[in-house]
Amino acid sequence: MVWRQLEVTKAHVAYSCLGIFSSIFSLVSLFVKERLYIGESMVASVFGLIVGPHCLNWFNPLSWGNTDSITLEISRILLCLQVFAVSVELPRKYMQKHWLSVTMLLVPVMTSGWLVIALFVWILVPGLNFPASLLMGACITATDPVLAQSVVSGTFAQKVPGHLRNLLSCESGCNDGLAFPFVFLSIDLLLYPGRGGEIVKDWICVTILWECIFGSILGCIIGYCGRKAIRFAEGKRIIDRESFLAFYLILALTCAGFGSMLGVDDLLVSFFAGTAFAWDGWFATKTHESNVSNVIDVLLNYAYFVYLGSILPWKDFNNADIGLDVWRLIILSLVVIFLRRIPAVLLLKPLIPDIKSWREAMFIGHFGPIGVGAVYAAIMSKSQLESHLTDEETPLNYTPGKGSKHWQAMACLWPITCFSIITSVIVHGSSVAVIMLGRYLNTVTLTAAPTSRTASTSTKNSWLQSLPPFDKSGRPFSLQRLDKETSPTPGQIDVRTSGMIAAPALGMRQRWRQKLHGNKETESDIEMSDLQRQREEHTGTIDLNDTTTETLGTTNARTPGLAQRSKVNIMNRTETVNTIYGLDKLADDTENHDVYHVETSRVHDIGSSHDDVYTYEFDADSIDSLERERIKLLREPEQQAYIAYTEDNQVIIENRQGEILEYARSHNDGVRDAEAGSHNQGRHKRASSPPLERLRQITNEACKTKYYAYKVGNDLIVEDESGEEFRRYRISPHGGKRKIKKKKINNPVPERKNHSLLHSEDEMADDEAESEEENYGDSDDLALFVKDHAD
């Protein structure tokens, strides 16, 4: 007789198994992901196999009841939550700006993959007709948003360019819902053979118009109403922080419920609801520092893949009665990995603006994971076929026996889908592809941070302190490049500039603003000069004001005369990028461009004519001033350069959201051209700023790794290790202090009251409750920081 306190149920064992796995894996998750390059989905599936009915039989969902029905609803909830989260985390108005790239991946690429998989299933599996093969292909065509998180978020994502992360994230969130037309067209072809009119009527009227189009409209309505409701509640201060963070989860469940009740595509409902909910970027800004969604996603992923690993039909993988053999499934898996997406993406690469190189096209084509979406599509398809055979509630807990109508299609559907998922989890669940891509990309992170130079607190003696301090007194000086007489090396540009630093509050930025209307070509230079500090970035940065041996070495820049070699700053590639970028921007005179051979274009200009919400040509009485201030604060971070990376002969500069700010390509003959994405409605070419070209040269792995900087009198000199002068700047202080007059400028663009656009994420989030004076404080000088990700 067992002690009655030890009456263990199946649910208790399931809780314990999930808890033990989640606890152990969480403790070693960083090691497994970064050292072993294995994702949590693979480890969870293996654990589910071990504790499942095929091994230890501790965790057996097959004994819980109708397994297909349980799996269908779990998959539905997980997908709706993940799809909604993906659409919320996209940059604001992403679908409007990148609709062509997303459409090319959703329509021609998915159609190609669907037909290719169907063809090989029809060839490899004996007894299946072509409509049944089309159904198999439709279930495993879409990419999975859950498995895609391994490349679009987390540590691995830092090795992938932001525009690729956004593209993969958007595609994975949208194409699960767009798999419905392929699935139901295959079902109609299977159920109504030879009845073309019935097929067309059912597919167009029911699937396309009702399930997809009406479902998308329903999602937009839910998202729009949710956005207005939460903004009203937050404005009235009647919602607490916890409910505010959980609101998007509530909306995702609402989409799943209404979508299922109305018989529409609930995944499309969730995606478009999330897109409409986060359309203006307000919610994403408010919850930027919160990790609630990530925590929930991790817990759901752990539990789901343990569950999935325990219910995989291992016996059916080698079941000759239904026409399946292991070798057939292995060949089919190779076809799925290599022919499902890669050929179509490579072929359409010139038509996809967000794919900038063949390597990126190869990566986008390769990374098409199959996971939860395929499970959902397979069980839903099986349920639809079973509903035409029986009056019982579907999906059934068993597969109809041999001899019943469409029995082989229903019997093969689940094993083929599961084997494809296993292959995808092994191939895409690891991050080797991401690591290999990052190995070829030379990335430089650009951030800005305020530093203070006071006699009482600053003990550092950096050579950059040889520049006059940018104090609040507004003491002016000019910085002039003197290396104009040196012959440019191949791939180098010759720029002769001079400039003047004025008062921080209404100095250089005001002068730039005034010249903006007379010289439109300098707009990108102005935007690139505002490098925004990102406080949540936890990676190390290099401070040019730091004179330790780890950064710039020892120096005595104040010593007049020729600097001794021991007093010279020895800089690596990263520090040289930082120095050249910062000093060239200081020395840049917008009225004296003498740039040859380089031409770039602004790929996306925030607030351009097609973005009518963010243009400032409006009546001041029509829009509240707080709303205009909020819009301005949203636009500013999007115009700040965050990361630059080079690949082959091109350099790409992105903001923190992954939107491409500048994209330049250099050819061997010295002539460079620029390419713009399709979302830019006109190519406005301009002369490239020197830092853009310098980033391409210095981040090149073939360039020299050591540079020397020293001061001779009023000259700052930068040399490479061979002794060739790389840059020379002359500092010309101007006596006296300038008196600054504040005057009102009739400019439709609200005037910034500070030279530095430094503000925290919390200030951006609460922009409607704070005035402009609170958002921008007095600025000290601006120090550039650079983090090199190339190594």
Curated annotation (Swiss-Prot):
Residues 763-781 have a biased composition (Acidic residues). Gene3D superfamilies: 1.20.1530.20. It comes from Zygosaccharomyces rouxii. NCBIfam families: c_cpa1 (TIGR00844). This is Na(+)/H(+) antiporter 1. One of its GO terms (molecular function) is sodium:proton antiporter activity. Residues 750-762 have a biased composition (Basic and acidic residues). It comes from the Eukaryota. Glycans are attached at N291, N545, N572, N754. One of its GO terms (cellular component) is plasma membrane. Residues 729-745 have a biased composition (Basic residues). It is found in: Membrane. It is a multi-pass membrane protein. The chain crosses the membrane at residues 12-32, 36-56, 70-90, 105-125, 128-148, 173-193, 203-223, 244-264, 267-287, 294-314, 319-339, 361-381, 418-438. Belongs to the fungal Na(+)/H(+) exchanger family. InterPro entries: Cation/H_antiporter_C, Cation/H_exchanger_TM, Na+/H+_antiporter_fungi, Na+/solute_symporter_sf, Nha1. One of its GO terms (biological process) is intracellular potassium ion homeostasis. Its main location: membrane. The gene is SOD2. Residues 670-694, 729-791 are annotated as: Disordered.
